[in-house]
C-alpha cells in the first residue's frame, strides 16, 4: 500500500512535525500492512491518496487509523 499525504505549505507545519507524523503512521499501519510506503510533502493544498488497496473496507480502515493518529497528538511530545 502507498499513502501520499500533501499538507498545504501555508499551514506552516515544521518538518520535524511531519517526520513525527510519518513515524507514528508507520507505527500504527505497519503491523496490519507490512508493505506500507508513506510519503508526506508540502504542497498547494491538503490531500490524501491511497493506492494498492483492494477493498473499500480496507480503505476505510486505513483512513480511520490515519484520522485517529492525526487527532491523538501525543506523538508530538
UniProtKB/Swiss-Prot annotation:
Coiled-coil residues: none
Sorted UniProt keywords: DNA damage, DNA repair, Transposable element
Gene3D superfamilies, alphabetized: DinI-like
Family statement drawn from the similarity comment of this UniProt entry: Belongs to the DinI family.
UniProt cross-references to InterPro entries, sorted A to Z: DinI-like_sf, DNA_damage-inducible_DinI-like
Protein name stated in the entry: DinI-like protein in retron Ec67
One of the GO BP terms on file: SOS response
Amino acid at each position: 500500500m502507498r499513502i501520499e499525504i500533501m499538507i498545504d505549505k501555508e499551514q506552516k507545519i515544521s518538518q520535524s512535525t511531519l517526520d513525527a507524523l510519518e513515524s507514528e503512521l508507520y507505527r500504527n499501519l505497519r503491523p496490519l500492512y507490512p508493505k506500507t510506503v508513506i510519503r508526506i510533502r508540502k504542497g498547494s493544498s491538503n490531500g490524501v491518496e491511497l493506492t494498492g488497496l483492494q477493498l473499500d473496507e480496507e480503505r476505510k480502515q486505513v483512513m480511520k487509523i490515519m484520522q485517529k493518529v492525526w487527532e491523538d497528538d501525543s506523538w508530538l511530545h
